[in-house]
A protein has these predicted regions:
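The feature marks the mature, well-folded catalytic cores of soluble enzymes
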Residues: 1-233
Length: 233
């Protein structure tokens, strides 16, 4: 099943009309296997980077993104939860209410959460990310056991044309046999790489210079789309 949701330019910040045509155009071009059944899930707004699942019935998301008035204003949080559980076959949803930088990401193991920890009290993200850290410490797995938490360093400030860019090591990309981690020409790059090596001991950890990419306000995870094996013809 191939779900086609609405992408509205990260909460109507940018025009996204052409983006929303990609999935149906690929279907018309017969890009996908004949066994793939497309399903029109519009007008529900859901961007890929806003949800994370352990593949075991638990999904993690943020209130600020998914329940934003610029995305799904016609649905209350309880309605969002029922909808997500229904279409994805979920047992439960963990809602994060803190952390305005996209600095959290679950990895492929269902017992681990990798997240950004900010230790600089003068950093503008400190309070929000500290609150997020305390929040996820209270999360438990479906069996009641706590998650294994792996902190990633807060990336050094990256500025361009007078603006601070959303550099984060949590924007890593999991792929077959490897994990690509954003590098920002900082001593913290190797710290982040070592942390992810702890989380993914069975994969190669590869650093990618993302200073050019971050100028577009995103990184590795933001600019990629993963399809399950067998989807592409």
């Amino acid at each position: 099943m191939l779900y086609d949701f609405v992408f509205n330019g990260w909460g109507m910040k940018f025009a996204a009309n052409h983006d929303n045509l990609i999935t149906r155009n690929l279907c018309h071009m017969k890009t996908f296997s004949d066994e793939v059944v497309p399903a029109n899930m519009q007008p529900f707004v859901l961007e890929g980077g806003s949800i994370e699942s352990d593949g075991k019935g638990t999904l993690m998301t943020t209130v600020e993104c998914l329940a934003s008035v610029n995305r799904n204003e016609y649905l209350q949080q309880e309605e969002l939860e029922r909808y997500l559980k229904d279409i994805f076959g979920l047992d439960r949803i963990l809602w994060i209410t803190s952390g305005y930088l996209a600095g959290d990401d679950t990895d492929s193991r269902e017992d681990t959460i990798a997240y950004v920890r900010c230790e600089d009290e003068e950093d503008e993200h400190y309070e929000e990310l500290k609150a997020m850290e305390e929040e996820i410490k209270e999360f438990t797995r479906a069996n009641g056991e706590p998650y294994r938490l792996i902190p990633l360093p807060m990336a050094d400030k990256v500025e361009w044309e007078g603006e601070r860019l959303p550099a984060t090591y949590a924007n890593f990309l999991i792929m077959n046999g490897a994990v690509l981690v954003p590098f920002y020409d900082s001593p913290k790059d190797e710290i982040a790489k070592a942390a992810l090596r702890e989380a993914f001991s069975d994969r190669e950890i590869i650093g990618i210079n993302c200073l050019p990419l971050i100028k577009q306000h995103g990184s590795l995870h933001c600019v990629t789309m993963q399809y399950p094996e067998g989807f592409i013809e």
